[in-house]
């Protein structure tokens, strides 16, 4: 039994791409890192990336990043917990994160 996934919901699953030194080094292996919503599943993330960027995804690895303490004035709080997805693309496919550069 297959589940029909709404295209608008798929677009909302991807929060932002991660552009750190470690994530940039993974671009050489055709791997892209994204912050995704915590309730997103691997098949949904795969469908969202394929729909938004018109590429073929060969693998998705996910990890829940821990909450971090954040000081706001004299009060201590927490930054929200996020889920991070490392998406591996088919050889030859690529995502243009910075179209003007």
From Swiss-Prot:
Keywords: Ribonucleoprotein, Ribosomal protein, RNA-binding, rRNA-binding. Belongs to the universal ribosomal protein uL23 family. InterPro entries: Nucleotide-bd_a/b_plait_sf, Ribosomal_uL23-like, Ribosomal_uL23/eL15/eS24_sf, Ribosomal_uL23_CS. GO terms for biological process: translation. One of the early assembly proteins it binds 23S rRNA. One of the proteins that surrounds the polypeptide exit tunnel on the outside of the ribosome. Forms the main docking site for trigger factor binding to the ribosome. GO terms for cellular component: cytosolic large ribosomal subunit. It comes from the Bacteria. PROSITE patterns: RIBOSOMAL_L23. This is Large ribosomal subunit protein uL23.
């Amino acid at each position: 039994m297959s589940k029909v996934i709404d295209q608008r919901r798929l677009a909302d699953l991807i929060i932002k791409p991660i552009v750190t030194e470690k994530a940039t080094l993974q671009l050489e292996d055709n791997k892209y890192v994204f912050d995704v919503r915590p309730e997103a599943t691997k098949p949904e993330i795969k469908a969202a990336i394929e729909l938004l960027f018109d590429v073929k995804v060969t693998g998705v690895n996910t990890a829940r990043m821990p909450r971090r303490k954040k000081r706001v004035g004299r009060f201590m709080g927490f930054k929200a917990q996020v889920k991070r997805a490392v998406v591996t693309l088919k050889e030859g496919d690529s995502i243009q994160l910075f179209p003007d550069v």
